[in-house]
A protein has these predicted regions:
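Secreted, periplasmic, or luminal enzymes acting at the cell surface/secretory milieu
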Residues: 2, 6-7, 12-17, 21, ...
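Short, glycine/acidic-rich beta->alpha junctions
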Residues: 20-25, 60-64, 109-110
Length: 179
């Protein structure tokens, strides 16, 4: 088992003046992936990007996470991504990887649960709780989001969530209940 950090969780502070760049961390991860039977990349959204009481500005993952996944997948054809977070994200690298495990917000036992799934000790049986769109532009809230400081307009009527995508006959990456 070889570990490589791959990216930083948050932006540098004054005390971090000597830390490696994201590009250097990605390069280390690529080198580790080249010799591995399987490369497992952990990415997603931390409390720096989403949380209770505030909205995200985009459904994109951090650029350094996307760059890391693509670079590792290019170096190792057997790349599996473990995605953490509490909401939908775009995954431009999805066609480049062998597998995806959406671990959600795992809490204190999340690491053990992910390890049990990755090693085959348990069979994952969860289903998606949201529809994963192909882009933000096909989302029913596009054009109304993010709203104002105290208001949020929901103009999709009863066609919220998966009902919108079904009624509009839109292709999606993962439908509600997938898995």
């Amino acid at each position: 088992l070889t570990y490589a950090q791959g990216y930083y969780k948050s932006a540098p502070t004054k005390k971090d003046k000597n830390r490696l760049s994201d590009a250097e961390l990605t390069k280390q991860a690529v080198e580790a992936a080249k010799g591995a039977d399987v490369a497992v990349v952990f990415v997603g959204l931390t409390e720096d990007f989403e949380g209770e009481g505030y909205d995200r500005e985009t459904i994109n993952m951090p650029a350094n996470h996307n760059a890391l996944v693509s670079a590792v997948a290019k170096a190792n054809a057997n790349t599996v991504v473990v995605l953490a977070g509490g909401s939908v994200v775009l995954m431009p690298w999805l066609g480049e990887v062998k597998g995806l495990l959406n671990s959600g917000l795992g809490g204190q036992a999340g690491g053990i649960a992910v390890a049990n799934i990755l090693t085959g000790a348990v069979n994952p049986s969860g289903k998606t709780s949201e529809t994963y769109p192909t882009s933000f532009e096909v989302n029913p809230t596009y054009g109304n989001y993010p709203g104002g400081p105290v208001t949020s307009e929901h103009k999709e009527s009863v066609f919220i969530g998966y009902r919108y995508y079904d009624s509009a006959n839109l292709d999606v990456v993962f439908p509600f209940g997938y898995g």
